[in-house]
């Protein structure tokens, strides 16, 4: 069993996202450690890109701050190698096709596997085009994780059958960000995934408080939270780790109790 699937074995998974290098890689490293200490079952690491089309203003801002601070893909790989000495939970990268292309698909997959990454999410690569990337990652034992947005029943079933690691169910159309109300019938979406496959299904996009997290955990195998964490980092900068720790603990408790 892959390390990613194992993350869903002990009840509902809590999956936080962080943009690498905002405000700097040293702080990112500390934040990842405190997130794991406070219950994160799997961690998503964002590799910054200058035009992150799936992201709302919060994560876009983090991308630009990180790039301005001189973060590179190689520096992120080095940080992950350091983290892996202490962190055993699965970690996946979330980035854009261009970042992987410009590094070289095979080289990126090889280096990511070497430093101990478990998978990759490319939100701007449609399902039909994922085979351009998947073989290189498969060869390295990594999962290329598919996103499913509200779409036709047939398409949801098709993606679920082919999916690796876990399925990232997008709770609302549009970009990432905190929502007051989540309107998509995401429960129905997860049900369709489950009818097509036994792969774990996690819900993300727009979840920002324990009540929403508990509600989404009831409907799925896990909950993904990004913007709310990135906003704390934006607010507190190098002092963010303790604030993120507290937030992650409250979210994991809510997910656990659902």
Predicted regions and their residues:
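N-terminal amphipathic alpha-helix/helix-capping segment at the start of soluble metabolic enzymes
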Residues: 1-18, 80-84
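Hydrophobic faces of well-ordered beta-strands that scaffold small-molecule active sites
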Residues: 14-18, 43-45, 91-95, 120-122, ...
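Glycine-rich phosphate-binding active-site loops on the catalytic face of alpha/beta enzymes
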Residues: 40-51, 117-121, 126-129, 171-177, ...
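Active-site beta->alpha loop and helix N-cap motifs at the rims of alpha/beta catalytic domains
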Residues: 47, 60-123, 255
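Catalytic beta/alpha-barrel core
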Residues: 68-71, 116-129, 143-151, 157, ...
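Catalytic cores of alpha/beta
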Residues: 25-35, 151-161, 203, 207-223
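Glycine/Thr-rich beta-alpha phosphate-binding loop at enzyme active sites
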Residues: 61, 69, 156-195, 232-234
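Alpha/beta catalytic cores of nucleotide-metabolism and tRNA/nucleoside-modifying enzymes
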Residues: 76, 191-202, 208-258
């Amino acid at each position: 069993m892959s390390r990613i699937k194992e993350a869903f074995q002990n009840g509902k998974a809590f999956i936080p996202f962080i943009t690498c290098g905002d405000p700097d890689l040293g702080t990112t490293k500390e934040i990842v450690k405190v997130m794991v200490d406070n219950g994160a079952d799997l961690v998503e690491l964002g590799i910054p890109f200058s035009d992150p089309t799936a992201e709302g203003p919060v994560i876009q801002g983090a991308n630009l701050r990180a790039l301005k601070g001189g973060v590179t893909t190689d520096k992120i790989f080095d940080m992950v190698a350091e983290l892996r000495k202490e962190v055993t939970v699965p970690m996946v990268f979330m980035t854009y096709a261009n970042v992987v292309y410009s590094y070289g698909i095979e080289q990126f997959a090889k280096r990511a596997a070497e430093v101990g990454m478990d998978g990759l999410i490319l939100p701007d690569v449609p399902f039909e085009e994922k085979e351009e990337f998947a073989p290189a990652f498969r060869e390295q034992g990594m999962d290329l994780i598919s996103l499913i947005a509200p779409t036709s029943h047939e398409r949801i079933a098709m993606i679920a059958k082919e999916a690796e690691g876990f399925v990232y169910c997008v709770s609302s159309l549009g970009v990432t960000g905190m929502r007051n109300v989540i309107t998509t019938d995401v429960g129905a979406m997860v049900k369709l995934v489950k009818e097509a496959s036994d792969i774990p299904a996690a819900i993300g996009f727009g979840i920002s408080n324990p009540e929403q997290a508990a509600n989404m955990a009831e409907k799925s195998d896990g909950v993904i939270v990004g913007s709310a964490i990135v906003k704390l980092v934006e607010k507190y900068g190098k002092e963010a780790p303790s604030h993120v720790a507290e937030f992650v603990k409250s979210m994991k408790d809510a997910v656990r109790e659902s």
